[in-house]
Amino acid sequence: VKKRTFLKLSSSLLATPSLSTLANWMADEKLKNWAGNLQYSTTRLDQAKSLQQVQKLVKGYEKMKVLGTRHCFNGIADSTTQFVSLVEMSQVLSLDAKAKTVTVDANVKYGDLATYLDAKGFALHNLASLPHISIAGACATATHGSGVKNGNLATAVAAMELVLANGEVRTLSRAKDGEAFRAAVVHLGGLGVVTKITLDVQPTFQMRQYVYENLPMAQLKEHFDAIESSAYSVSLFTDWQKNRVNEVWLKERVEKGKTAAAKPEFYGAKLATKNLHPIAELSAVNCTAQMGVAGPWYERLPHFRMGFTPSSGKELQSEYFVPARNAVEAILAVERLRDHISPHLMISEIRTIDADSFWMSPCYKQASVAIHFTWKQDWASVKKVLPMIEKELAPFKARPHWGKLFTLAPVTLQSRYEKLPEFKKLMADYDPKGKFRNAFLDMNLFGK
């Protein structure tokens, strides 16, 4: 997408006082995702400024999808007919200090919310590796950070408002709706248009992060649980070569009375002497501060700074979740494929996520370890490697990240979600004519 994207709207595009219509997208503009690997199947794009406008637009379309921050690498958010943007619905609506919740428009980005919360003395429990993503999109796909005691980002959701296919507004909350709420939080875009989200918050806190280099894989095999439990959030970066983890990122909360001195060694890895990028050859200028320098939670939990592009964007991503109890076996299984993986890989990241109770979450009722791959943008090669990885991870019933690339057969994927039959019934209840279904959902949830 050109720098003058649809997000930078001029007043000349306003069709009426009530609706900002972008249907006359210029013919030479191709609507793509952030990475540039996916060209969306339509350029028809309308914009809503209010809940009432969302209702009007939804009722008027036979088929539609919401276009968010476009950080998914597959077609989960694609449409062949019509997009709606909520970019002008990006406000923090209220902060309840007593209840410790914040309510926001669903299109708000984590980075923007974080600065607001910190200024008010509050924080979120966790963030993803980059803060440029929308809250609605991240929760819908069970996007996560790391930490053995940290659930994915959706676990902070206390309530949500969504517009159903008939234009009805439905509000669900953890306190009042129980299983119906847990069914809908990770909704994959298949239930309606989420317009408002309430998140749990906690008192703000400071963090520091240290990076260690060259952790022997043998140490990881012997001490995986101890390594992953050694800080509030831990990330392991590896290229699967030389029998080692290239970098270990330890993100710890600053606690009163706790020493800030870092050990020179960590399970055989050496303390870094300068800030590093997860891919060591790249500049760390766009990464969050390291070297034990204390700072706000939102400037340490992500790997990348809000004000910088996390990378060139020309990449592909895949990720697989396995039960935490099988972590070492799964890592060794992937390592056996190193000669197939490495020619196409930029870097892999290994993270931990606590269990949750959301029907379509990869971490449903299981504490998980996620093995992530950032690939060079060569889909022809990557799609040959993914089946090899999926075969090696099959004994652990690995579940792919909903917003990243995978090649699992639909029936295999479906078998790994025990609540899928009930979720499909819920989709039929909320959206009887399939207004919010698309090719991705049709294939992966309903395909044979």
Residue ranges and their predicted role:
Residues 2-448:
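Noncatalytic alpha-helical scaffold of FAD-dependent oxidoreductases
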